[in-house]
Amino acid sequence: SAVTLGKFDGIHKGHQKLMEKILAKKDQDLKSVVFTFGQMPGTNIYGKGRTILTRTERQIHLEAMGIDYMIECPFIPEIIQMEPEDFIKKILVEQLHVKYIAVGPDFRFGHNRKGSVGLLKQLAPLYDYEVEVLEKERLEDKVISSTYVRHMLESGEMEKVHKLLGYPYYVSGTVVHGHKIGR
């Protein structure tokens, strides 16, 4: 498989570059896998400590891009406490049969975030996979990040949000009919 790993909140243009890389491996008969982490307890949609997209919205975006699989790894002790080398061997190699990994330069994983891009590269020859590290995408000389997107949302800079995401931001929800006193 061709795998990219991360939180992917908002699926901004930086995330999209990673996904383009794994999608390009389809010509080598590799399935595209987005390995993401479930929401930490206590997080909600948008705002500080919250997500830009819901899980369902993220899944819809990935399907539209042509991603074969989205794996949402839960925040459970077995995963949180897993050593980085074990994560590579047990999850990436044995479960996902990884042949190609695309990540950003600051990707961290494993217990206490001890795993790094350097470790992924170091173990690549042993487990027979390729690692590609993509530089951060920029817009107007600023690094594109989910934090920056959230900041622009909070500031009401919707045109900039559109440029950062590459698609119009939207909010979805259920209309609740209150006491109808505002008529």
Give residue spans per PLM region:
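Structural signal for conserved beta-strand scaffold positions within catalytic alpha/beta enzyme cores
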Residues: V34, E72, V133-E135
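Active-site cores that bind ATP or allylic diphosphates and position pyrophosphate for catalysis
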Residues: K89, V93-R183
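Generic detector of short, locally flexible boundary/turn motifs and exposed helical patches
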Residues: S1, F35-G38, M65-M70, L96-K99, ...
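Residues at the starts of beta-strands that form the adenosine-phosphate
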Residues: D29-V33, Y69, E130
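N-terminal Rossmann-like or analogous alpha/beta NTP/dinucleotide-binding catalytic cores
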Residues: T43-Y127
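N-terminal catalytic cores of NTP/NDP-binding nucleotidyl/phosphoryl-transfer enzymes
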Residues: S1-R55
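Active-site-proximal loop/turn and secondary-structure-junction residues that shape catalytic pockets
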Residues: G38-P41, I76, E137
